[in-house]
Amino acid sequence: MKIEHEGNNLRVSEILELNAINASSFRDEVRAAMPAAPETIEIDLSQTRFVDSSGLGALFALYKAANSSHDGVTLRLLNPRPSIQQLFELTQLHQLFEISRTDVDAAKLQTASSKLH
């Protein structure tokens, strides 16, 4: 797993699986890396082959942690494979997370958001 900071933004990538074996350490490492006042947390799922219920729980816990002390934090999931996208839809978590199919979509959203502020 790779974690990068850019100002108050955090990007997590190179996640091969998010399951019962690694979900707790994933959640704890990302939580520890969160900036004091995060604006956007991006989790790139393009390399992720498998997510189970523990992985979903870790993502939800990160969402709650980011938003419990700071309003307006965006947790964006990037490039999930179709099977993982389907899992988000089946569990209705796609209504909670912002999901972008490409990095280009994320850049467009960021540009649009900055024009509003």
Each model region followed by its residue ranges:
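STAS-like cytosolic regulatory interaction modules
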Residues: 1-50, 61-117
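Conserved phosphotransfer microenvironments
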Residues: 55
